[in-house]
Amino acid sequence: MSQQFAPRDAAEAARAAFASVEGKPFPDDIFTAPQLTWAVIGCGVIANQMASTLELAGRKLAGIYNRTHEKAVAFAEKYGVARVYDTLEELCADPAIDAVYITTPHNTHITYLRAVLSAGKHVLCEKAITLNSEELNEARAIADEHGVQLIDATTILHMPLYRELIRRAEKDEFGNMSIAQVSFGSYKDFDPENRFYNPRLAGGAMLDIGVYALTMARMFMLSQPEDVVSIANACNTGVDVTSGIVMRNPDMQMAVISLTLHSKQPKRAVLSFENCYIEVMDYPRADRA
Protein backbone atom coordinates (compact mmCIF):
# COMPACT_ATOMS: atom_id res chain seq x y z
CA MET A 1 0.00 0.00 0.00
CA SER A 2 1.18 3.53 -0.62
CA GLN A 3 -0.46 6.43 1.12
CA GLN A 4 0.86 9.75 2.32
CA PHE A 5 0.16 11.28 5.71
CA ALA A 6 2.15 14.50 5.45
CA PRO A 7 1.55 17.43 7.82
CA ARG A 8 -0.22 20.24 5.95
CA ASP A 9 1.77 23.09 7.43
CA ALA A 10 4.24 24.04 10.13
CA ALA A 11 1.60 24.51 12.82
CA GLU A 12 0.25 21.03 12.14
CA ALA A 13 3.76 19.64 12.38
CA ALA A 14 4.12 21.33 15.75
CA ARG A 15 0.83 19.86 16.93
CA ALA A 16 1.96 16.41 15.87
CA ALA A 17 5.32 16.72 17.60
CA PHE A 18 4.11 17.60 21.08
CA ALA A 19 1.50 15.77 23.13
CA SER A 20 -0.34 17.16 26.12
CA VAL A 21 0.36 15.76 29.56
CA GLU A 22 -2.59 13.41 29.10
CA GLY A 23 -0.68 11.72 26.28
CA LYS A 24 -3.18 12.89 23.65
CA PRO A 25 -2.59 15.16 20.66
CA PHE A 26 -3.16 18.86 21.07
CA PRO A 27 -6.53 20.08 19.77
CA ASP A 28 -6.77 21.53 16.27
CA ASP A 29 -6.09 25.05 17.53
CA ILE A 30 -2.67 24.76 19.10
CA PHE A 31 -2.96 28.25 20.54
CA THR A 32 -5.75 27.11 22.88
CA ALA A 33 -3.94 23.88 23.83
CA PRO A 34 -2.96 23.30 27.47
CA GLN A 35 -0.34 25.94 28.22
CA LEU A 36 2.45 24.19 30.06
CA THR A 37 5.51 26.25 30.91
CA TRP A 38 8.53 24.34 29.58
CA ALA A 39 12.19 24.25 30.49
CA VAL A 40 14.83 22.17 28.74
CA ILE A 41 17.90 20.33 30.00
CA GLY A 42 20.68 20.34 27.41
CA CYS A 43 21.27 22.67 24.49
CA GLY A 44 22.26 20.38 21.62
CA VAL A 45 20.50 19.68 18.33
CA ILE A 46 17.33 18.29 19.92
CA ALA A 47 16.97 21.22 22.31
CA ASN A 48 17.32 23.60 19.36
CA GLN A 49 14.59 21.71 17.51
CA MET A 50 12.33 21.96 20.56
CA ALA A 51 12.84 25.72 20.82
CA SER A 52 12.24 26.21 17.09
CA THR A 53 9.09 24.09 17.12
CA LEU A 54 7.61 25.96 20.06
CA GLU A 55 8.25 29.20 18.17
CA LEU A 56 6.10 27.82 15.32
CA ALA A 57 3.30 27.54 17.86
CA GLY A 58 3.83 31.09 19.07
CA ARG A 59 5.42 29.98 22.32
CA LYS A 60 8.86 30.04 23.94
CA LEU A 61 10.86 27.93 26.32
CA ALA A 62 10.82 29.48 29.77
CA GLY A 63 14.07 28.06 31.11
CA ILE A 64 17.24 26.14 30.32
CA TYR A 65 19.85 24.23 32.31
CA ASN A 66 23.09 22.91 30.83
CA ARG A 67 26.21 21.68 32.58
CA THR A 68 28.24 24.18 30.55
CA HIS A 69 26.71 27.45 31.67
CA GLU A 70 28.15 29.52 28.80
CA LYS A 71 26.39 27.31 26.25
CA ALA A 72 23.10 27.72 28.11
CA VAL A 73 23.50 31.51 28.05
CA ALA A 74 24.13 31.48 24.28
CA PHE A 75 21.10 29.23 23.75
CA ALA A 76 18.91 31.53 25.84
CA GLU A 77 20.01 34.57 23.86
CA LYS A 78 19.28 32.81 20.56
CA TYR A 79 15.74 31.76 21.50
CA GLY A 80 14.72 34.41 24.01
CA VAL A 81 14.65 32.01 26.98
CA ALA A 82 13.93 33.99 30.14
CA ARG A 83 15.68 31.83 32.74
CA VAL A 84 19.16 30.29 32.68
CA TYR A 85 19.68 28.08 35.71
CA ASP A 86 23.07 27.77 37.37
CA THR A 87 22.24 24.36 38.84
CA LEU A 88 19.81 21.51 38.32
CA GLU A 89 18.47 22.16 41.82
CA GLU A 90 17.60 25.73 40.83
CA LEU A 91 15.53 24.50 37.90
CA CYS A 92 13.75 21.91 40.02
CA ALA A 93 12.89 24.49 42.66
CA ASP A 94 11.36 26.97 40.20
CA PRO A 95 7.56 26.96 40.68
CA ALA A 96 7.07 28.66 37.32
CA ILE A 97 8.13 25.53 35.41
CA ASP A 98 5.45 22.88 34.75
CA ALA A 99 7.36 20.50 32.48
CA VAL A 100 10.93 19.70 31.50
CA TYR A 101 12.29 18.21 28.28
CA ILE A 102 15.43 16.15 28.91
CA THR A 103 17.51 16.21 25.71
CA THR A 104 20.91 15.11 26.99
CA PRO A 105 22.68 11.81 26.12
CA HIS A 106 20.91 8.78 27.54
CA ASN A 107 23.60 7.88 30.08
CA THR A 108 22.57 11.02 32.02
CA HIS A 109 18.80 10.51 31.92
CA ILE A 110 18.15 8.70 35.18
CA THR A 111 19.96 11.38 37.20
CA TYR A 112 17.79 14.11 35.70
CA LEU A 113 14.63 12.01 35.87
CA ARG A 114 15.05 11.42 39.59
CA ALA A 115 15.54 15.11 40.29
CA VAL A 116 12.86 16.58 38.03
CA LEU A 117 10.11 14.05 38.72
CA SER A 118 10.75 14.30 42.47
CA ALA A 119 10.23 18.05 42.12
CA GLY A 120 6.71 17.40 40.84
CA LYS A 121 7.28 18.39 37.23
CA HIS A 122 6.12 16.57 34.10
CA VAL A 123 8.92 15.16 31.95
CA LEU A 124 9.35 14.52 28.24
CA CYS A 125 12.56 12.50 27.91
CA GLU A 126 14.60 11.73 24.83
CA LYS A 127 15.39 8.18 23.79
CA ALA A 128 16.65 5.92 25.12
CA ILE A 129 14.53 7.05 28.06
CA THR A 130 16.68 4.95 30.44
CA LEU A 131 19.47 2.41 30.09
CA ASN A 132 17.46 -0.55 31.41
CA SER A 133 14.10 -1.61 32.82
CA GLU A 134 15.20 -1.14 36.43
CA GLU A 135 15.88 2.55 35.84
CA LEU A 136 12.60 2.96 33.95
CA ASN A 137 10.59 1.28 36.70
CA GLU A 138 12.23 3.56 39.25
CA ALA A 139 11.40 6.67 37.20
CA ARG A 140 7.80 5.54 36.70
CA ALA A 141 7.41 4.95 40.43
CA ILE A 142 8.66 8.47 41.19
CA ALA A 143 6.27 9.94 38.60
CA ASP A 144 3.34 8.03 40.09
CA GLU A 145 4.29 9.07 43.62
CA HIS A 146 4.30 12.75 42.67
CA GLY A 147 1.30 12.64 40.32
CA VAL A 148 3.15 13.75 37.20
CA GLN A 149 3.52 12.40 33.68
CA LEU A 150 6.67 10.77 32.27
CA ILE A 151 6.55 10.66 28.47
CA ASP A 152 8.97 8.87 26.14
CA ALA A 153 9.98 11.21 23.31
CA THR A 154 10.86 8.46 20.81
CA THR A 155 9.56 9.95 17.55
CA ILE A 156 7.70 6.84 16.41
CA LEU A 157 5.39 6.98 19.41
CA HIS A 158 4.04 10.41 18.45
CA MET A 159 3.84 10.39 14.64
CA PRO A 160 0.53 10.85 12.77
CA LEU A 161 1.38 8.07 10.30
CA TYR A 162 1.51 5.38 12.96
CA ARG A 163 -1.57 6.61 14.77
CA GLU A 164 -3.45 6.20 11.50
CA LEU A 165 -1.99 2.78 10.73
CA ILE A 166 -2.73 1.52 14.24
CA ARG A 167 -6.28 2.87 14.00
CA ARG A 168 -6.83 0.95 10.77
CA ALA A 169 -5.17 -2.18 12.12
CA GLU A 170 -7.45 -2.09 15.16
CA LYS A 171 -10.44 -1.91 12.79
CA ASP A 172 -9.09 -5.15 11.24
CA GLU A 173 -8.62 -3.60 7.81
CA PHE A 174 -5.34 -5.45 7.32
CA GLY A 175 -6.08 -8.76 9.04
CA ASN A 176 -3.72 -10.35 11.53
CA MET A 177 -0.04 -9.42 11.45
CA SER A 178 2.26 -12.44 11.43
CA ILE A 179 5.72 -10.87 11.23
CA ALA A 180 7.48 -7.51 11.33
CA GLN A 181 10.89 -7.08 9.70
CA VAL A 182 12.74 -3.97 10.83
CA SER A 183 16.27 -2.79 10.02
CA PHE A 184 18.42 0.18 10.96
CA GLY A 185 22.03 0.62 9.90
CA SER A 186 24.35 3.60 10.06
CA TYR A 187 28.11 3.66 9.57
CA LYS A 188 29.87 5.46 12.42
CA ASP A 189 33.64 6.00 12.34
CA PHE A 190 35.21 4.17 15.24
CA ASP A 191 36.30 6.38 18.11
CA PRO A 192 36.51 4.69 21.51
CA GLU A 193 35.77 8.01 23.22
CA ASN A 194 32.62 9.04 21.37
CA ARG A 195 29.08 8.26 22.47
CA PHE A 196 28.59 5.47 19.93
CA TYR A 197 31.45 3.28 21.15
CA ASN A 198 32.25 4.37 24.69
CA PRO A 199 30.68 2.07 27.31
CA ARG A 200 30.93 4.81 29.95
CA LEU A 201 28.59 6.87 27.73
CA ALA A 202 26.24 3.88 27.27
CA GLY A 203 27.34 3.40 23.67
CA GLY A 204 26.25 0.66 21.31
CA ALA A 205 23.73 0.01 18.57
CA MET A 206 20.91 -1.14 20.83
CA LEU A 207 20.61 2.04 22.88
CA ASP A 208 21.35 4.42 20.00
CA ILE A 209 19.32 3.00 17.10
CA GLY A 210 17.77 -0.20 18.41
CA VAL A 211 15.19 1.84 20.32
CA TYR A 212 13.60 2.84 17.01
CA ALA A 213 13.52 -0.67 15.59
CA LEU A 214 12.16 -2.34 18.72
CA THR A 215 9.51 0.35 19.16
CA MET A 216 8.44 0.02 15.54
CA ALA A 217 7.94 -3.73 15.84
CA ARG A 218 6.33 -3.65 19.27
CA MET A 219 3.71 -1.04 18.29
CA PHE A 220 2.08 -3.50 15.91
CA MET A 221 2.35 -6.63 18.03
CA LEU A 222 -0.75 -7.54 20.03
CA SER A 223 1.16 -8.57 23.16
CA GLN A 224 4.54 -8.37 24.81
CA PRO A 225 7.14 -10.74 23.30
CA GLU A 226 8.04 -13.60 25.63
CA ASP A 227 10.60 -15.41 23.46
CA VAL A 228 13.64 -13.33 22.51
CA VAL A 229 16.80 -14.60 20.80
CA SER A 230 19.68 -12.34 19.81
CA ILE A 231 23.23 -12.55 18.51
CA ALA A 232 25.54 -9.55 18.67
CA ASN A 233 29.04 -8.56 17.62
CA ALA A 234 30.94 -6.26 19.96
CA CYS A 235 33.83 -3.93 19.20
CA ASN A 236 36.99 -3.79 21.29
CA THR A 237 35.40 -1.38 23.77
CA GLY A 238 32.80 -4.02 24.57
CA VAL A 239 29.67 -2.34 23.20
CA ASP A 240 27.39 -3.97 20.64
CA VAL A 241 27.86 -2.78 17.06
CA THR A 242 25.89 -5.32 15.01
CA SER A 243 23.05 -7.54 16.12
CA GLY A 244 20.19 -9.72 14.97
CA ILE A 245 17.11 -10.10 17.17
CA VAL A 246 14.12 -12.43 16.82
CA MET A 247 11.08 -12.01 19.08
CA ARG A 248 7.79 -13.93 19.41
CA ASN A 249 4.74 -13.17 21.53
CA PRO A 250 1.94 -15.47 22.82
CA ASP A 251 -0.18 -14.47 19.79
CA MET A 252 2.45 -16.15 17.57
CA GLN A 253 3.48 -12.84 16.03
CA MET A 254 7.18 -12.48 15.30
CA ALA A 255 9.62 -9.64 14.77
CA VAL A 256 13.01 -9.91 13.07
CA ILE A 257 15.31 -6.97 13.70
CA SER A 258 18.78 -6.13 12.33
CA LEU A 259 20.97 -3.34 13.70
CA THR A 260 24.44 -2.12 12.87
CA LEU A 261 26.78 0.80 13.43
CA HIS A 262 29.35 -0.72 11.05
CA SER A 263 27.61 -0.37 7.69
CA LYS A 264 24.86 1.35 5.77
CA GLN A 265 21.47 -0.33 5.93
CA PRO A 266 18.04 1.04 5.02
CA LYS A 267 15.83 2.28 7.82
CA ARG A 268 13.09 -0.02 6.58
CA ALA A 269 10.12 -1.74 8.18
CA VAL A 270 7.86 -4.34 6.55
CA LEU A 271 4.71 -5.32 8.44
CA SER A 272 3.17 -8.49 7.01
CA PHE A 273 -0.59 -8.85 7.48
CA GLU A 274 -3.09 -11.38 6.10
CA ASN A 275 -4.56 -8.92 3.60
CA CYS A 276 -1.51 -6.84 2.70
CA TYR A 277 1.98 -5.86 3.66
CA ILE A 278 2.95 -2.35 4.70
CA GLU A 279 6.42 -1.08 3.83
CA VAL A 280 7.73 2.02 5.58
CA MET A 281 11.00 3.57 4.45
CA ASP A 282 12.92 5.82 6.84
CA TYR A 283 10.42 4.78 9.51
CA PRO A 284 11.87 6.94 12.33
CA ARG A 285 10.82 10.03 10.33
CA ALA A 286 8.23 8.68 7.90
CA ASP A 287 5.08 10.45 6.72
CA ARG A 288 3.91 7.77 4.28
CA ALA A 289 3.64 4.00 3.94
Q: Where are the regions a protein language model picked out?
A:
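Rossmann-fold dehydrogenase core element
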Residues: 137-155, 176-180
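Predominantly a Rossmann-like dinucleotide-binding segment in NAD(P)-dependent oxidoreductases
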Residues: 156-228, 236
